[in-house]
Amino acid sequence: MKNIYSPSFRSMSRGLALTLGLLLALLLSLPSYAQDGQSKVPINRTISGFTLGVTTPAEARAIIQRQGGKIIAEEGAQNGGDDGGYAFTGFKYARRPTSLITLHFYKGHPRKIAFVFDKLDVLEQIESELENKYGMMAEGKETSKMKSKVIFDAFTFLEVVRRFEYEGHVGFDHAYIAYTDAELDRARLAEKESEI
């Protein structure tokens, strides 16, 4: 049996205590993005030429035309309407074709941009690239016909959403990747709640 009062045992105990103390300090100093859902780097706010919270509807229209896109629906965006927006085609996201892009405005600036895909394998490739860049996404809202994953920073939410034809997540229908300006989204929600 070891004598716990011997000098060699005390130095070993001090070494163990020091090691455990350093390990605890290291764990406590882990960056906050070590948690799922919080981005390890700032999320890009300029996507396909549109900058969340900055680009005006007129600038957005010019970007769409300059890049060869075609506006297929427009609602209130030309007047800077609170919930105006464009739906357009002809753009790629991460070098992959999209079936539709929607750009939603609030107070005359982009609040959200969503890229719609009709192929699940394309979405999964992009999702993997996003997680490599920003970190592990957290499980988001889920219903019987929809699943989502999210990652965020102080200014931007990035969401990957899968929609299904049938309940129980059966029969892939389409998916989208959406970037949302956190401040504009909060302001819009507060305004909507005050109307109730």
Where do the PLM segments sit?
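Non-cytosolic coordination micro-motifs
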Residues: 35-78, 112-196
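Bacterial N-terminal signal peptides that target proteins for export
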Residues: 2-20
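Bacterial N-terminal signal peptides
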Residues: 17-29
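Generic cytosolic/nucleocytoplasmic N-terminal low-complexity/intrinsically disordered segments
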Residues: 1-2, 91, 132
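Sec/Tat signal peptide C-region and signal peptidase I cleavage site
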Residues: 30-34
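Mid-chain, structured segments of secreted extracytoplasmic proteins
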Residues: 77-124
